Amino acid sequence: MILPMSSACLGQFLRASPRGMIEQFNRAPPLRVSIRGAAGVEKSLGLGRNAGSQQGMQKNQLQDKIRKQLREVQLSPSSYDTAWVAMVPVQGSHQTPRFPQCIEWILQNQHDDGSWGTNLPGSVVNKDILLCTLACVVALKRWNTGRDHISRGLNFIGKNFWVAMDEQTIAPVGFNITFSGLLNLATGTGLEFPVMQTDIDGIFHMRKIELERDAYGTASSRRAFMAYVSEGLGSLQDWDQVMAYQRKNRSIFNSPSAAAATVIHGHNDSALCYLDSLVSKLDGPVPVMYPQNAYSQLGMVDTLEKMGISNNFSCEISDILDMIYRLWIHNEEELMLDMGTCAMAFRLLRMHGYDISSDGMAQFVEQSSFDDSIHGYLNDTKALLELYRSSQIRCLEDDLILQDIGSWSARVLQEKISSKMTHKSEMLEVEYALKFPVYATLERLEQKRNIEQFKTKEQLKIEGFKLLKSGYRGAITHDEILALAVDEFHSSQSVYQQELQDLNSWVAQTRLDELKFARLMPSITYFSAAATMFPSELSEARIAWTQNCILTTTVDDFFDGDGSKEEMENLVKLIEKWDGHGEIGFSSECVEILFYAIYNTSKQIAEKAVPLQKRNVVDHIAESWWFTVRGMLTEAEWRMDKYVPTTVEEYMSAAVDSFALGPTITSAALFVGPELSEEVFRSKEYIHLMNLANTIGRLLNDMQTYEKEIKMGKVNSVMLHALSHSGGGRGSPEASMEEAKREMRRVLQGSRCDLLRLVTRDGGVVPPPCRKLFWFMSKVLHFVYMEKDGYFTADGMMASANAVILDPLQVTLLPSGLGTL
C-alpha cells in the first residue's frame, strides 16, 4: 500500500534519526480499562488488575447465554398490551373474557408498590410504568376482579400522576393518546383517581393538542400513526380506515393492543385469529410487537458484528441469515413492511454473500416512502440511518434503486442536522454516518466506538422506548455482550501491542531504518491490518500485511527519486532473478538493504505458510514483487525522460501495478484459512480482484496528490484526463481539472461496485476469506485517502492507530452489571 504524497505531514510525529525516520513508539503500558460509573463495577465485571480475564463470569458462560438468545427469541412481556388483550370479550358474551390467562398474569405480576411494567428498584417512575399500570387497572375493572390490585394500582397512579404531565419525561410512542384513552375508559367504568380534576382535564387537553397539531410527516403518515395508536382513540377513530393497515397475519402493525382494540370496538373479528395464535403460543402475557423474530434476530446479529464478537457465533448467525433469506425471497411482511428491518436485512444478507437484488428495496426509492409512514411522522432517525447505510452496499454502478435511496436519505439526514430536529446522541450518529460511508470504515475502530457507546440493560430499561407504544427492551443479553466484547477487545490489544513490538524489531533487523529516505511508520501501517483483520488468531496475516506495506512504501520512495536510474534497474533485475540474485550483485548498499529486506521477509512468510498451504508459495510473493517494481520503474523512466503518456489507459497500465498491493494481499492471503492452489493465484478472478483493488488505490491517490505530483514532474490520471478533454487548449484549466476529478470519481465508484460484487458473490475460485482481504484493503484506502475535512492528518491517523492498539476502553457500566448469572 502506498501512503499518499500528502503524508509528508506525517513528519510532524516522526523523529529524525541517523538511521532514517522511524516513528516514536514506546513500550505500551500494562493493559487497563477505564470505567466510568458507580463503585464496585470492576468487581462485578471481573475487570480488576487483570483486565483480560473474566472473574465474575467465565467466557464460555457469556457465550452460552448469548448463543441461547440467538437460537431462540425470548419475547419480553408487555403489561400494556397484555391488558388490552385481556379486555377482549368472548364473542356474543360481553360479560366473559376471551383470554382469562391474560387476566391471571396481570394478577400475578403486580409490583409491591402497586405498579405494573418494568419497575426498577430505586429508580424514578416513568411514563411507561404509569401507562402499564393504568392499562392493567382498567383491564381488571372491566371484569370486576382483583379489587385489592385495583386499589393499590389507583393509589400508585395518584401518587405519580404528575409524571404524565411532565413533558420533559421520556415517553412511549403516542403516550398522550394512549394514556388519555385509557383514562377515558377508566372514568367511564366508575374508577376514581386520587387526583385533582384539573389534572385529569390537563391530560385530555394534551390529547386535544396532539390531535390538532400539525405532525412532522404528511397526512398519510398521520393516518398511519393514528391507526397504530387506535386503541387510544376509541369512538374518535375511523375504524374502517384502520382496517386498511391490517396485515396478512390479521394484526394492525403487528401490535397486539391495536388488534385487541379493533375487536373490542366490533370492527375486526378476523383479528381474533391473530390474538388466539399469540395467546396460545405464549399462554398469558403478550409482547409489545408480534411477530418479532426477524426484527430481534437481525438486531442481535448486527449488534454482535458491531461489537466485534460475531466470530464466536458463526454457526448461529449462519442459521439466522438463512432464515432471513427465506423470508426475503418469499417477500414476507414481517421483514419487508418495516423500513429499518428490511434495510438491515438487505445490508447483512448482501455483505454475507447471499444472492439478492435490490428489487426488495424498490419500495423505498421515493422519499415519500419515509414521509408518508409512521417513521416519517415520528421523525425516526434510526430507520432512516439504516436505509442510508444499506444504500451504500452497491454491487452495480447503475443500480438506480440504491442510488436514489442514498440520494434522498442523505439529503434528509443532512436536513436533520441543519434543523437540529434530532436528539444530541442521534445527531452525532447522523454526522458520523454522513462523514464515514460504509466503504470507508474500519471494523476495529468502529467496534471500539460501539463498545464505548453500548448501553447496559439498566440504561436500556430507562431509554429503550424507541418506536413502540410500550417500553420494548427485548430479552437481548446486553450485559453479557458488553462483557464479552470488553474482554476480547482487551485481549486483542495485548496481542496487537506485542506484534507491534515484533515489527519494530523486524525493521531494525532488516536495516530499513538505515535508509534516510524511508518513511517508516510501523504503528500506523500495522493499524491498517489490526483494524480490519482484528481476530487474534490472524496474527501472521497482520504481520505479513504490515511488513509488505512498509516495504512497498519504502520501495516507492526509492523509485520516486531517492534512487538513481542505475540503482532502480539493479533492484528490478535482482527481484527478477530472485534466488539467482548472486549472479548480478548490488550497485549500492541501499539496493542491497532493500533487496534483502524484500527477499528474506518473503522467504520467512512463505516458510510460515507451509503448514497451512502444504507447499512453498514464495514464487507467488516474488512474482507480485516483480510486477510491482516493473510498474514503478516504468513510471520512474517516464519522469526522468519527461515523457507524458498519451492516454489514461497507457498510464494505468503501469500505475495499477505500481500501487503495490500485490505483495501485501498475496502474503496476507496465505494465513486467513483456506489452502490456496496454483489455480487460485493464476485465476482470472484473482487477477481481476487485484486489478480492481490497485485501481481503487491509484485513483484515490491521484485525486488527492495530483497538484503535488504535477510540481514533481510526475504524471497522474487526473492530469492526463484533464489534458485529453481540454479541447486543444480551449476552456478553463480549472474547469478541465474539475471535470477530470468528477470522471475519476465515477470510475472509482464503478471499480468499488465491481469489487464488492466479486467479494460478496456466491461461488468463485478464490475462497471468500481471501476475497474479503481485497475489500478490507479498499476500506483502508478510502479511510486513508478520505477527502472530507482533511481527516488524513498526523494527529488523526495516530489517534486512530492508538485507539485500536494502545488506548484503554472508556466504558460506562452500572452496578447491577452481570449479577444475573
UniProtKB/Swiss-Prot annotation:
Keywords: Lyase, Magnesium, Metal-binding, Plant defense
Presence of keyword Cytoplasm: no
Parts forming coiled coils: none
SUPFAM superfamilies: Terpenoid cyclases/Protein prenyltransferases (SSF48239), Terpenoid synthases (SSF48576)
Keyword Metal-binding appears in the UniProt entry: yes
Residues reported in the UniProt entry to bind Mg(2+) 3: N701, T705, E709
CDD domains: Terpene_cyclase_plant_C1
Pathway recorded for this protein: Secondary metabolite biosynthesis; terpenoid biosynthesis
Gene Ontology biological process terms, A to Z: defense response; diterpenoid biosynthetic process
Motif DDXXD motif per record, residues: 556-560
Binding site for Mg(2+) 2: D556, D560
Cofactor(s) named in the record: Mg(2+)
A GO molecular function held by the record: ent-pimara-8(14),15-diene synthase activity
Reactions mediated catalytically: ent-copalyl diphosphate = ent-pimara-8(14),15-diene + diphosphate
Signal peptide: none
Tissue specificity remark: Highly expressed in roots, at intermediate levels in stems and at lower levels in leaves.
Known EC number: 4.2.3.30
Enzyme class: lyase
Cofactor info, note text: Binds 3 Mg(2+) ions per subunit.
Binding locations of Mg(2+) 1: D556, D560
Family label: Belongs to the terpene synthase family.
Protein role: Involved in the biosynthesis of ent-kaurene diterpenoids natural products. Catalyzes the conversion of ent-copalyl diphosphate to ent-pimara-8(14),15-diene.
Notes on the domains: The Asp-Asp-Xaa-Xaa-Asp/Glu (DDXXD/E) motif is important for the catalytic activity, presumably through binding to Mg(2+).
Name this protein carries in UniProt: Ent-pimara-8(14),15-diene synthase
